[in-house]
Curated annotation (Swiss-Prot):
UniProt KW rRNA-binding keyword: yes
Oligomeric form and interacting partners: Part of the 50S ribosomal subunit.
Gene Ontology MF terms: rRNA binding; structural constituent of ribosome
InterPro entries: Ribosomal_uL4 (IPR002136), Ribosomal_uL4-like (IPR013005), Ribosomal_uL4_dom_sf (IPR023574)
Entry GO CC: ribonucleoprotein complex; ribosome
UniProt-recorded name of the protein: Large ribosomal subunit protein uL4
GN (gene name): rplD
Domain of life: Bacteria
Length: 224
C-alpha cells in the first residue's frame, strides 16, 4: 500500500519544446498540483459560480408602475358590458407593464478560496494525466512578434481546436503573436482558473509561467 501511495504521488515529467522544434530538457509537474483526483461535482460548482459572477445582472423590465401613461381609467366602471379596467398599463394590455420580469441583481456566489484552488488542481490533473499539458521555452524566437511562427509552433504541439496559452504578463512578444489566433486563449499564471482549463483541449505553459504558478502554490520551482 505504501508503495502504491508513493507511486501515486510521483511527479509527472514533460518535455520542454523550443520554437525551432527541438527539446530543451524536461520539467517536473508536482503531483500535489497535477496528479490529484478530479472532483467533478466540485469543478462543476466552481465553474457555475465563475460563470454566474461574469453575468452583468443589469437586466430590467418595467412594471405597471414604471410604464408612463395609463393614469386615466380607460372607460367607466359599469354599464359597458366589458370587464372592469383601471389602467391601460396593466399587464394584460399591449404596452402595459411586465409581471414578475427580471430586475437588476447580483448573480455572484460565494465560493471559498480552498474550493477554487482544489477545483483548479483537479482540472489541471485531468489534463496532465491525458498528456494535454505542454511546456515551451517561448512561443516565438527572438523579440519580434510573429503570428505565423506561433501558429506553426502550436500546430506541432497539438492539433486540437481549443488551446489555452499560459505565459508571463511581461511576455508581450508571445501575447502579440497568438492573440489573433482562433481557438487560442491567453492567460497569465495568476489568472489560471478551472473554467478556462476545462474549456481548453490543451494547456501550453511557458517555463516561466509554469515556474510562477508552481512557486505560488507550492514551495517548489521548476528548472528546465
Amino acid at each position: 500500500m505504501a508503495a502504491q501511495n508513493q507511486s501515486a504521488q510521483k511527479d509527472l515529467e514533460i518535455q520542454v519544446k523550443t520554437p525551432d522544434g527541438k527539446v530543451d530538457g524536461s520539467v517536473a509537474l508536482p503531483a500535489e498540483l497535477f496528479d490529484v483526483p478530479a472532483n467533478i461535482a466540485l469543478m462543476h460548482q466552481v465553474v457555475t459560480a465563475q460563470r454566474a459572477a461574469a453575468r452583468q445582472g443589469t437586466h430590467s423590465t418595467k412594471t405597471r408602475g414604471d410604464v408612463s401613461g395609463g393614469g386615466r381609467k380607460p372607460y367607466r366602471q359599469k354599464g359597458t358590458g366589458r370587464a372592469r379596467q383601471g389602467s391601460t398599463r396593466a399587464p394584460q394590455f399591449t404596452g402595459g407593464g411586465v409581471v414578475h420580469g427580471p430586475k437588476p441583481r447580483d448573480y455572484s456566489q460565494r465560493t471559498p478560496k480552498k474550493m477554487i484552488a482544489a477545483a483548479l488542481r483537479g482540472a489541471l490533473s485531468d489534463r496532465a494525466r491525458n498528456g494535454r499539458i505542454h511546456a515551451v521555452t517561448e512561443l516565438v524566437a527572438g523579440q519580434t512578434p510573429s503570428t505565423k511562427s506561433a501558429k506553426t509552433f502550436l500546430a506541432t504541439i497539438t492539433d486540437r481546436k481549443q488551446v489555452l496559452v499560459v505565459i508571463g504578463r511581461d511576455d508581450q512578444t508571445g501575447v502579440k503573436s497568438v492573440r489573433n489566433l482562433p481557438g487560442v486563449h491567453i492567460l497569465s499564471p495568476d489568472q489560471l482558473n478551472t473554467y478556462d482549463v476545462l474549456r481548453a483541449d490543451d494547456v501550453v505553459f511557458s517555463v516561466e509561467a509554469l515556474n510562477a504558478y508552481i512557486a505560488a502554490n507550492t514551495s517548489e520551482e521548476v528548472s528546465a
